[in-house]
């Protein structure tokens, strides 16, 4: 089948008709300003089950991180609570277990009237974000701060281990590794991510959805060539799973 675009006239497009094939990886390419994004974002039918994955900033506070954004923190908290016989809220830096000095931020923000604010590591929790008594609870020898300091790759192995098998957490971590974010720390603030990293984090979430058509806008931005190959392998797997993938891109490897 095809996705039909008729009479596209957004920005510098002039009455363009295009049939985009479905069930394959389709690349929309062209020089900068040629109307690639206008053609797709401005003209795709809204009812086509399309999942748009862009590089726009992720909404969230400076407390947000990959663990909270992907929903990963929920199964992690549940695993800690079950292992220690306490309530899950203790294992959230935004809830009952937060360090009282920095309110779970791990840093102290000092606003200076005439200059840029100053950020210092909290002396009480030493940047770990949790109360000392919460850090005494462990899961397979690791406290919650140590788990949130792990990279996605390390955490994927940790939650696949027979002693802490947690399928919900492992599934999310596997998707993060699949999109090339295996190096990302679970507790890293979202405000520190690049546009390409934000886009791939969104893709990791959308991969769990039932959408039939994925649209990615220049997903290779900021990627090393080896990571581009990993991304292409992922897109191929999406197509093999019956999805349609439309990529707006001018990277020659794609």
Name every feature range the model reports, one short phrase each.
Residues 1-254:
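Conserved phosphate-binding elements of NTP-dependent enzyme cores
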């Amino acid at each position: 089948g095809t996705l039909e675009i008729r009479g596209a006239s957004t920005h510098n497009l002039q009455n363009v008709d295009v049939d985009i094939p479905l069930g394959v990886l389709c690349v929309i390419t062209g020089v900068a300003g040629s109307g690639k994004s206008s053609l797709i974002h401005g003209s795709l039918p809204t009812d086509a089950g399309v999942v748009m994955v862009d590089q726009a900033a992720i909404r969230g506070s400076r407390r947000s991180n990959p663990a909270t954004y992907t929903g990963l923190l929920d199964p992690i908290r549940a695993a800690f609570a079950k292992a220690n016989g306490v309530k899950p809220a203790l294992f959230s830096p935004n809830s009952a277990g937060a360090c009282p000095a920095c309110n779970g931020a791990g840093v102290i923000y000092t606003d200076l009237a005439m200059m840029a604010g100053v950020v210092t590591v909290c002396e009480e929790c030493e940047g770990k974000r949790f109360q000392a008594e919460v850090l005494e609870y462990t899961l397979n020898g690791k406290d919650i701060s140590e788990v949130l300091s792990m990279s996605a790759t390390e955490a994927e192995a940790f939650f696949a281990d027979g002693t802490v098998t947690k399928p919900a957490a492992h599934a999310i971590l596997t998707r993060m590794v699949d999109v090339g974010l295996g190096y990302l720390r679970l507790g890293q603030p979202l405000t520190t991510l690049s546009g390409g990293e934000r886009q791939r984090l969104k893709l990791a979430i959308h991969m769990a959805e039932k959408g039939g058509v994925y649209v990615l806008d220049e997903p290779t931005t900021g990627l090393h060539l080896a990571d581009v190959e990993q991304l292409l392998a992922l897109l191929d797997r999406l197509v093999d799973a019956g999805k349609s993938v439309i990529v707006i891109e001018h990277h020659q490897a794609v």
